Amino acid sequence: MNIKKISVSLLTAALLVGCGSGKSSAANTKKDANGRVLPADTGKKDIDSLKFQFVPSRPTDQIIKATSNLGNLFKAKMKEKGYNIGKVDISVSDSYEAAGEALSAGSVDVAWLPGGTYALYSNDSDVVLTATRHGFKNDSTNPKDWNGDANKTQNSDKPVTYYKGLIYAGPSAYGRKLAAKVNAGEKLTWEDLDKAKWAVRDVTSSAGYIYPTMWLQEQCKGKGIKDLSKVTTLNYAAEFQQAAAEQIDIIVCYADGRQDYEKQWQKEWGRKDSIWNELNVIGVTQNVYNDTVTVTMKKPEIYNKEFMTAFQDSIIEISKTEEGKKIFGIYKHSGYAKASDKDYDGARQALKAVQK
């Protein structure tokens, strides 16, 4: 699969969307220093429907089940703030980029996006919240510190605004060879990594593509995922399943994806040993800024200061309830904080780095 061609075409499409003609993306026509349309001060209070969309970083059926009551909770909170919302439709996109494109087109009103996806589509969408999450007791940058039952990842009560991406070697014969080198304190070479069969995520996925590419560039003198010989694009569940089946040597994921697939590793996928012993971390990325909640700029009733403030307050309030914690726990989000576009300048720089 030619990852480079896909990433270039996505960037081109995003730029075309961002520069296209048509109606103004908001009632206000004023623009900021970067040419982005600024939100109007206010908009209408009666809104027939809203469309929320989540990205498929977890299995779609699990996301739909977890978020099934979010619409009702949101409508009630907005009612307290003077808004009458008719209905809230919740869906899961086919890919990260599909959610970004839907926001850009205005066919989706709100989306939960990784920082890298937001950075690519921020000409026509605006971040309003950033996720917070509980960190881990282990925050090491040394990959071997993450491996084995003795180093099983444990959650911390400390909230953090970042997470790490992890590069894992699976239990295939070649994956075990790579893990043995890392656990012995040896550095992996480009030749070592290029011989492996890799599985990655969409090209705007922070932990599934962008930051692993930056890790490769740092380790291998500028080489990235697009330079690897054997790469396939899978969702996270398929990555772990194919690693368990020894069909893939290296997978990439957020820290620590092994928590999400620990039971399946042995009960469903037939592995005899634990995921902590068999799926070894061989690389740790830089810190990734947390996921976003982003609104479209295409609809004046959405893209105005009054609505966005009410939206921010409502989601934050929901996230503090027991039911809200369960809903957003599907993404390991422990809460939300108000955000601004400039918070994701680093994500834009990272995105540019992987396109070189």
Task: Enumerate the predicted regions with their spans.
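Pocket-lining segment of extracytoplasmic ligand-binding domains
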Residues: 182-189, 194-302
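C-terminal motif of bacterial Sec signal peptides marking the signal peptidase cleavage site
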Residues: 15-18
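Short helix-initiation/N-cap motifs at beta->coil->alpha
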Residues: 83-101, 114, 224-245
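Bacterial signal peptide processing site
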Residues: 20-23
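A conserved helix-loop-strand patch within extracytoplasmic ligand-binding domains
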Residues: 133-205
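Periplasmic-binding protein-like
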Residues: 49-56, 131-155, 161-164, 269-301, ...
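Beta->alpha turn/N-cap motifs
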Residues: 54-56, 94-96, 106-119, 124-125, ...
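An extracytoplasmic/periplasmic, membrane-proximal ligand-sensing/linker region
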Residues: 30-54, 58-69, 219, 299-356
